[in-house]
Amino acid sequence: MGTVHARSLDPLPMQGPELGVQADDMDLGEPEREEKQEVLENKDVVVQHVHIDGLGRTKEDILTYEIADVFHAKNLIDVMKKSHEARQKLLRLGIFRHVEVVIDTAEGADALPNGLDVTFEVRELRRMTGSYNTMVGNNEGSMVLGIKLPNVLGRAEKLTFQFSYGTKETSYGLSFFKPQPGHFERNFSLNLYKVTGQFPWSSLRETDRGVSAEISFPIWRTSHTLKWEGVWRELGCLARTASFAVREESGHSLKSSLAHAMVIDTRNSTILPRKGALLKINQELAGYTGGDVSFLKEDFEIQLNKTLFWDSVLSTSLWGGMLLPLGEKASSIADRFYLGGPTSVRGFSMYSIGPQSEGDYLGGEAYWAGGVHLYTPLPFRPGRGGFGDLFRTHFFLNAGNLCNLNYGEGPRAHLSKLAECIRWSYGAGIVLRLGNIARLELNYCIPMGVQSGDRICDGVQFGAGIRFL
């Protein structure tokens, strides 16, 4: 809860030889202690003043929303509870290094007998901070350097410059973030970026230069994000041996799209949950706000987690998506879905399922993938209560398919095609949770349902990332 200081509303009895009162002369029986406890916990109080000490460049109006509930407290316990909640809100703004709370009796000419003053002692972050860290993506590691200007305009705004150098991707960007006063979950962000990625499974190199604007807000138990993005995309071949199908995709394109994402997440952890569920739905519409790329793209993700006996966890997941080109132009290799690898359908090489040409995987316009997982403690529980709890034994069954659809046919024909040539795999391994950052998997995989052109990874397969099927 941090540091909370409180002083009793009534003066405590004093003792000592200089006062002529000895401890033996005082009645310290149980009934009086119970009465004192009742006074502290249940006596009605009024919060008269709330002070914030230590402000420099922060505007006070942005903080008024975060501490307003403290004035509604009715007793001392309620004051402490609401003060702690206000402290958490202040820290969530990301503009203070630390926040301490002091609760004291009210002072001044207008002080009431049951009045309280609450003081938040804050220390602001420096005007500029730097950071260096490593990140783990979908089977990719990267080094990240960042410069941040927190509270740049005094109302919890944040200006960030970030450079990332990874094994397959290099990027840098500038972003501006501003929350709505009193509602941190409602915020606006503006981003400028350049990303260069290499995709060896497709012999493709892509460079994106873009700008995006996002608005995030909650509705009931759901989180929503509305986004506009304009991207200048440059596609090129990664090697001279690239297939003709990939060479045809080379060149420049301009994508302007509107996107919406909805998330319901009740999981206790995003990396290795033990309970809870996740529902994520994404829609993207390109072409109606400009550019030469037009499509409608839909995809979803569902995950359910249930704790079983002997500290084991059963997890099920389902992914799916569809891409519909609008107009006469075919879909781009940069917009299609990809499937396979240690983070999706295990036992297959990275994104090496589905349509391909001369060994280059071209992606598909429709896909689905599902998995059933059983996570158990390590045999004999070595390191229980400590480092050993970061490891779990992992048993899995994965399945999925990726293909292109003929949109002149009906839904029944589409479902029939998605049900054909299903790839699936099963196996077992060990999972290591790296805090709330990422997780590592080392599995022994047995791929089944392999189709012509698929690239498999029969045996031991290593995976690292955040999002796993």
UniProtKB/Swiss-Prot annotation:
List every stretch annotated Disordered.
Answer: 1-24
Keywords, A to Z, come to: Membrane, Mitochondrion, Mitochondrion outer membrane, Transmembrane, Transmembrane beta strand
Q: Which InterPro entries match?
A: Bac_surfAg_D15 (IPR000184), D15-like (IPR039910), POTRA (IPR034746)
* Cellular component terms per the entry's GO annotation: mitochondrial outer membrane
Q: How does it assemble?
A: Associates with the mitochondrial contact site and cristae organizing system (MICOS) complex (also known as MINOS or MitOS complex).
Task: Briefly state the protein's biological role.
Answer: May play a role in the maintenance of the structure of mitochondrial cristae.
Its name, as the record gives it, is: Sorting and assembly machinery component 50 homolog A
Q: What species was this sequence derived from?
A: Danio rerio
